[in-house]
Amino acid sequence: MSKSENLYSAARELIPGGVNSPVRAFTGVGGTPLFIEKADGAYLYDVDGKAYIDYVGSWGPMVLGHNHPAIRNAVIEAAARGLSFGAPTEMEVKMAELVTELVPTMDMVRMVNSGTEATMSAIRLARGFTGRDKIIKFEGCYHGHADCLLVKAGSGALTLGQPNSPGVPADFARHTLTCTYNDLASVRAAFEQYPQEIACIIVEPVAGNMNCIPPQPEFLPGLRALCDEFGALLIIDEVMTGFRVALAGAQDYYGVVPDLTCLGKIIGGGMPVGAFGGRRDVMDALAPTGPVYQAGTLSGNPIAMAAGFACLTEVAQPGIHETLDELTTRLAEGLLDAAQEADIPLVVNHVGGMFGIFFTDAESVNCYQDVMACDVERFKRFFHMMLDEGVYLAPSAFEAGFMSVAHSMDDINNTIDAARRVFAKL
């Protein structure tokens, strides 16, 4: 047995499923998950000593690559001054100044510890601000594991949501309406059925949890217009896309102004950090200035703030996003060419430093239904064959891939060459 196999066997006796987040268990592709010993730049190194070109990037945060010296040094220096104070620090102010400077739609920001905390807090704030209970989310979009968000669509287009996890009360789920991504008609229908009850829409501007689905040109502006028409707030969940699709996020890339924005992943530079913010009048409703309660013992802790500040300072440098786009475009085009040579039907979506690989005969993949029609079994074989080639992709047909500026063009070309060999045998 490999060392990863031995560790996984031991882990399953002590940790549910052997992992601390389900997708890491390789249940979407089968086999034994890799146990990682270290990471540097664009590479992961497992406990058995094998190196992999990494396109998971810790599920998005590692836009600068692993073990970036500026972030590492910032963490070391901050740790020398103390790990957590439970009191305000200067770095929290500096971090808030930087975030609101980089994302102009955020007049104010509140730091939290994860993307889930950011989205659940933003939704609570939207409900408190509007005095309404219902929310709209989209089928196939993931916004963390808060009860109100673990909801699937009912049997009809306008039915109330149903829990998709045991432990979520039906009374919670009924306040969540699930619409179809990239389908404005389904959103209007929900508003027309509940015109005075919907507090907010929450949306991934690029859906990264049904692989990578960009919005149609009219979709995000249409959501903004519907929120304005019916008096709801628009929450854009930029946990994946923030500082990755563009410096000011996908909202800037696509030209839409939200009322609230949720951030995570890159904002922490690899540390557990989330944030939400937006319009000043909405944020003023948050405790202690307003009645909507939100708190956290470790929110804004000095280690996380130092890492996040160092990361965002580097990400804001000229050329970062042009490099991400160039590398991702080259990878997408190369994979398509290699698949075509092997007569394998493939669609590759990409936006900025995000990409998605779909085995499908369809010309495009634009929504959850399109994703579910793809060949998942072929993806599973592709994943394991690429892993054997030393390329680490997301172990699920429903998760986006992530590029970093630490990837070199040689890394990209080597990945394409590996895919060409795999496609020939797939």
Curated annotation (Swiss-Prot):
It holds the Pfam family Aminotran_3. It is found in: Cytoplasm. Its main location: cytoplasm. It is an enzyme of class 5 (isomerase). One of its GO terms (molecular function) is pyridoxal phosphate binding. Its cofactor is pyridoxal 5'-phosphate. Gene3D superfamilies: Aspartate Aminotransferase, domain 1, Type I PLP-dependent aspartate aminotransferase-like (Major domain). The keyword Cytoplasm applies. The keyword Cell inner membrane does not apply. GO terms for biological process: protoporphyrinogen IX biosynthetic process. One of its GO terms (cellular component) is cytoplasm. Belongs to the class-III pyridoxal-phosphate-dependent aminotransferase family. HemL subfamily. PANTHER family: GLUTAMATE-1-SEMIALDEHYDE 2,1-AMINOMUTASE, GLUTAMATE-1-SEMIALDEHYDE 2,1-AMINOMUTASE 1, CHLOROPLASTIC-RELATED. This is Glutamate-1-semialdehyde 2,1-aminomutase. It comes from Citrobacter koseri (strain ATCC BAA-895 / CDC 4225-83 / SGSC4696).
